[in-house]
Amino acid sequence: MQQAPVVLSTLDKLLNWGRSNSLWPLTYGLACCAIEMMATGGSRFDFDRFGTIFRASPRQSDVMIIAGTLTKKHAEFMRRLYDQMPEPKWVISMGSCANTGGMFNTYATVQGADRVVPVDIYLPGCAPRPETLQYALMVLQDKIRRSKAIKQDAPKRLV
């Protein structure tokens, strides 16, 4: 007599698997890197195979991709968008300008997106190739799979 297969896993692994395979980035394209980000969404690189669908609303997104030069005028707006995203949320800083201000070392440029929002992954380059953004997404998926989905300070009992 053949028995039905049994799948054993933890709730953490199950939640993290679902989260890592359904990342919906909020696109925040500001300069040249935005063109490379748009190319990543095209058919040649096929972001959809990772379960990734670009969203224009922060309330439907869990990943923010900051692509390009961040000015001080945009910083407050970007922070507001970040605050509107539901938890858990992650940030990818794409390109030298988003990482460190790039060649724009002026009074009007934020010298790194991490001064405004917490950044999880930094992509170097000017502008990073679409393959680099795909690799960053795979690294983020791995990071999500290894994280704790259930907070330790959560109540032990629901009733």
From Swiss-Prot:
One of its GO terms (cellular component) is respiratory chain complex I. It comes from the Bacteria. It is a peripheral membrane protein. It holds the Pfam family Oxidored_q6. It is found in: Cell inner membrane. It is an enzyme of class 7 (translocase). One of its GO terms (biological process) is aerobic respiration. GO terms for molecular function: 4 iron, 4 sulfur cluster binding; iron ion binding; NADH dehydrogenase (ubiquinone) activity; NADH:ubiquinone reductase (non-electrogenic) activity; quinone binding. Its EC number is 7.1.1.-. The keyword Disulfide bond does not apply. [4Fe-4S] cluster binds at C32, C33, C97, C126. Binds 1 [4Fe-4S] cluster. Its cofactor is [4Fe-4S] cluster. Belongs to the complex I 20 kDa subunit family. NCBIfam families: nuoB_fam, PRK06411.1. NDH-1 shuttles electrons from NADH, via FMN and iron-sulfur (Fe-S) centers, to quinones in the respiratory chain. The immediate electron acceptor for the enzyme in this species is believed to be ubiquinone. Couples the redox reaction to proton translocation (for every two electrons transferred, four hydrogen ions are translocated across the cytoplasmic membrane), and thus conserves the redox energy in a proton gradient. HAMAP family: NDH1_NuoB. This is NADH-quinone oxidoreductase subunit B. It comes from Helicobacter pylori (strain ATCC 700392 / 26695). The lineage of its organism: Bacteria, Pseudomonadati, Campylobacterota, Epsilonproteobacteria, Campylobacterales. The gene is nuoB.
